[in-house]
Amino acid sequence: DHEQLLWNKGYNHCYILKDKMSEEMLEAASLYEPVTGRKMTVMTDLPAVLLYTAGYYDRPDTAICLETQFYPDTPSHSDFPSCLVLPEKAYEHCTLFSFQVQKEK
């Protein structure tokens, strides 16, 4: 019943992982389903991850999306990690989605 969850009809939130760019891969998120033991882990070198639960669709809360990205509105904020793409420099970032079955302990 949190105000932001009601207003957005679920999650539509950007979570900051780091405050400056580096090649370091960080765990952005993990999802676990205890009945089957399925687990998904998201690793990235990008500075943020967006969590979205599709609240505006016909059947809200039937999906979840984890999008690695730069901070929202980055070009308007000089203190945010730069998302500028230049023709002389290759754009290289990495996001890894790994899946496993984890038995309960």
Label the model's feature ranges:
Residues 1-105:
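Active-site pocket scaffolds in enzymes
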